[in-house]
Amino acid sequence: MCIRDSVWVAYTLTDDNELVIKYQATTNKLTIVNLTNHGFFSIQGIGNPTPTIDNIICEVNADFYLPIDETSIPTGEILKVEGTPFDFRKPKPIGQDINADNEQIKNGSGYDHNYVLNKKEEGELSFAARIKDPVSCRTMEVYTTEPGLQMYTGNFLEGIKGQHGATFPRRSAVCFEAQHFPDSPNRSYFPSVRLKPRETY
């Protein structure tokens, strides 16, 4: 029997300046589902004297993160952020430790790691991250029902063309990818990404 998956994604812009992303998936046979988005956010805006995200103030609601190997795959460990460049529990500039002499920073060429979000209950909609531009005071908050949040700082982007002839340099935007943990199918102790028939993701 062939696997027949049905996937539904809805993007909604609200009058409260929210972007709401909802996913739904069903299957007729056991399969793997771990949906996310890879939107880049450059809240400093075009014309900002500091075009990179180095001065953007960031907060991530996580006590733990997943270290990666040199191919950017999680090693399977779950490590504390405390005392590392990955500690964003208190707001700090993204660029403060992005070039630190740290093996994990080197493996990701910056931040490209999954955070284990602090949750009171599985599946609850809760605060995950916040960024603020200190110049314009623009602020973006991320809430999710997912257990993980991949933070990617545009480490491999260079010279991307944008609106009004603007060119975006390396690390000029950040991604917050709410999801289950990467490599979950190979790690039985990670939150499961298996979807069974008659279940709804």
Provide a role label for each language-model segment.
Residues R4-Y201:
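An exposed, glycine/acidic-rich loop-and-rim segment of catalytic or binding clefts
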